[in-house]
Amino acid sequence: MALPYHIFLFTVLLPSFTLTAPPPCRCMTSSSPYQEFLWRMQRPGNIDAPSYRSLSKGTPTFTAHTHMPRNCYHSATLCMHANTHYWTGKMINPSCPGGLGVTVCWTYFTQTGMSDGGGVQDQAREKHVKEVISQLTRVHGTSSPYKGLDLSKLHETLRTHTRLVSLFNTTLTGLHEVSAQNPTNCWICLPLNFRPYVSIPVPEQWNNFSTEINTTSVLVGPLVSNLEITHTSNLTCVKFSNTTYTTNSQCIRWVTPPTQIVCLPSGIFFVCGTSAYRCLNGSSESMCFLSFLVPPMTIYTEQDLYSYVISKPRNKRVPILPFVIGAGVLGALGTGIGGITTSTQFYYKLSQELNGDMERVADSLVTLQDQLNSLAAVVLQNRRALDLLTAERGGTCLFLGEECCYYVNQSGIVTEKVKEIRDRIQRRAEELRNTGPWGLLSQWMPWILPFLGPLAAIILLLLFGPCIFNLLVNFVSSRIEAVKLQMEPKMQSKTKIYRRPLDRPASPRSDVNDIKGTPPEEISAAQPLLRPNSAGSS
């Protein structure tokens, strides 16, 4: 898993191209300054302090950088090492790898997700993509005589590559080793778009560091950037002598290389920040730890995959019944009829337009079939002429050495289908002509009629209710006035008060007829009653 999966996918799916053989690279050193970490498991659960193996003096080591900015060189030339193309050039900037005036080598392409700012690495990648596209166009665009259907190339294209299968198998093996459930039925999925690689720190109990690999080629610089780090604790960290940090809560152990330049065995990487390195030269300013790199795979069980792919049905919530009834009545009385009328007119117009479109489709099919019939007639005439010209050599097919092709006229099926379409169009046109917008509205009358009675009652009540109310009020007022007029004389007679007895009118039964009194003086009940003086009475 040292090689990112979409790097070898790019190499596999795109055919390779050939370049002229460049001169060998001159980026060799007589003695390797790099050393390898070597761990030995002494007892389970404990890892001894790392030991280092330096290459013997005189062993040539090739050193190349994975990234070279555009402002580090004026010009670059191609060179070759171990059947691989590299760029070489002289550094013009002291801050560049190697220093000012030093000739260094770097990879032909930039690493995944990186750019050199429009330098030779980016230009080489663009050139490679253009050549591959032109090659694919040339291979698949050349027309060849028809010799039957050949799906062999399609099968080769669709076949999963061996290295991709190996990647899946390695992932599954690792899953079985680290998973306690040991899943047997699962789905391993790769993303179609680019996603960052996943960094998994080297676990505390790990016993596979004893693999020794001779380092004859060293790649300095980041191999992958923008990593996704899964864990930030229990890390095995690397500390160089020029670094200032000594403790970190995320690290459970520290290892200090004896030199500033060190490499890791294949399959293990230094992760510094969000970039992965195979070799470090001690110039990293951030904390580095040991990690594995895995592609951004997603593992699903059968149940998880089904729940992820197949969407669950959405259950409708049951609204409150009074709210439904109230909303239905208000909608029917307020805006129901207008909405139904608008929808009916809209669908009627849509049906007419659809009918016209179907008619045009039928006409297009008839026109296309006529063109095919005329083309077939021309081809048959040409075929007969070629058969006459090549009759001495056995006819056209024998002359070309190909299979004979015959034309089967199936225009009758197309004509029959067009006739059925036109019959349906005619029926729909008659239905629309007989129905009309008000005919479509009649289909909604069974739904509207139950609301017409309450609606008419409410309208009549609003129209005639005020008049009836005014009549009732006037009638009651007139009766009250009549009763008041009848009761007023009686009330006045009961409220008269006389000053003297002689002031009272004579009773019909009285025998005194010659007594003349003064007219009675009416005194209102509100005035005080005057009593006669005892001295003045006679």
From Swiss-Prot:
One of its GO terms (cellular component) is plasma membrane. The chain crosses the membrane at residues 444-464. Specific enzymatic cleavages in vivo yield mature proteins. Envelope glycoproteins are synthesized as an inactive precursor that is heavily N-glycosylated and processed likely by furin in the Golgi to yield the mature SU and TM proteins. The cleavage site between SU and TM requires the minimal sequence [KR]-X-[KR]-R. The intracytoplasmic tail cleavage by the viral protease that is required for the fusiogenic activity of some retroviruses envelope proteins seems to have been lost during evolution. The CXXC motif is highly conserved across a broad range of retroviral envelope proteins. It is thought to participate in the formation of a labile disulfide bond possibly with the CX6CC motif present in the transmembrane protein. Isomerization of the intersubunit disulfide bond to an SU intrachain disulfide bond is thought to occur upon receptor recognition in order to allow membrane fusion. One of its GO terms (biological process) is syncytium formation. The keyword Ion transport does not apply. CDD domains: HTLV-1-like_HR1-HR2 (cd09851). Keywords: Cell membrane, Cleavage on pair of basic residues, Disulfide bond, ERV, Glycoprotein, Membrane, Signal, Transmembrane, Transmembrane helix, Transposable element, Viral envelope protein, Virion. Residues 21-443 are extracellular. Disulfide bonds join C186-C189, C186-C405, C397-C404. Probably involved in the development of multiple sclerosis (MS). MS is a neurodegenerative disease characterized by the gradual accumulation of focal plaques of demyelination particularly in the periventricular areas of the brain. It leads to physical and cognitive disabilities. Viral particles or intracellular RNA of HERV-W family members have been detected in tissue from patients with multiple sclerosis or schizophrenia. Belongs to the gamma type-C retroviral envelope protein family. HERV class-I W env subfamily. This is Syncytin-1. It comes from Homo sapiens. The gene is ERVW-1.
